[in-house]
Design a protein with these regions (language model features):
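General beta-strand structural signal in soluble alpha/beta enzymes
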Residues: 6-8, 69-73, 95, 117-119, ...
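Conserved N-terminal alpha-helix of the aminotransferase class I/II PLP-enzyme fold
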Residues: 34-79, 100, 108
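A short alpha/beta connector and helix-capping loop motif
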Residues: 180-182
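Short, well-ordered alpha-helical microsegments
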Residues: 15, 79-81, 102-103, 152-154, ...
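PLP-dependent aminotransferase-like
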Residues: 77-144
Length: 182
């Protein structure tokens, strides 16, 4: 069988040595005699996986100790609801809509309060990032939301917008760990 290389958005090519290690550990993870999929999520072996993942992520991303690292299920779509449910204290948020994911986040936020579309590139099928140099940030907005990298349309924020002191919520699921984040 010849290898097929997938360079599309989402799952992509992995080195063969990584695939072989995963295959070897599928039946016996780290000498435990079982697969990770068979472990209790309360076991010491599984807790070690979580602790190591958090330690490595903190190191790679330079995450300070006063920040929490959460490993959550549900993916980006669940976060579209969790963000306004947890951050929309004044029931107002501003959204910069630059693609399908930001549009979905904006639509979901409307269920929890007033979501303002303060900039958008939907007029040209999300083919550009709008000028964010002087955004009409709502005085009572709890946060400003962006999707930092749009894999569907091939657009990306070159610099983060000035949110005038408001919390910036950035969906970075498609390019996390590709650059330093402050």
């Amino acid at each position: 069988m010849s290898r097929v290389y997938n360079f599309s958005a989402g799952p992509a090519v992995l080195p063969e040595e990584v695939l072989k290690e995963v295959a070897d550990e599928m039946l016996d993870y780290n000498g435990t005699g079982m697969s990770v999929m068979e472990m209790s999520h309360r076991s010491a072996a599984f807790q070690e996986i979580i602790d190591t993942a958090e330690k490595d992520l903190r190191e790679l991303m330079n995450i300070p100790d006063n920040y929490k690292v959460l490993f959550l299920q549900g993916g980006a779509s669940q976060q579209f609801a969790m963000i306004p449910m947890n951050l929309m204290k004044n029931k107002v948020a501003d959204y910069i809509v630059t693609g399908q994911w930001a549009k979905k986040a904006y639509q979901e936020a409307q269920k929890y309060g007033k979501a303002n579309k303060i900039a958008s590139s939907e007029d040209k099928t999300f083919s550009y990032i709008p000028d964010c140099s002087d955004l009409p940030i709502s005085p009572d907005a709890d946060y400003v939301y962006i999707c930092e990298n749009n894999t569907i349309y091939g657009t990306k924020f070159k610099e983060l917008p000035n949110t005038k002191g408001k919390i910036l919520v950035a969906d970075m699921s498609s390019d996390i760990l590709s650059q330093p984040v402050n």
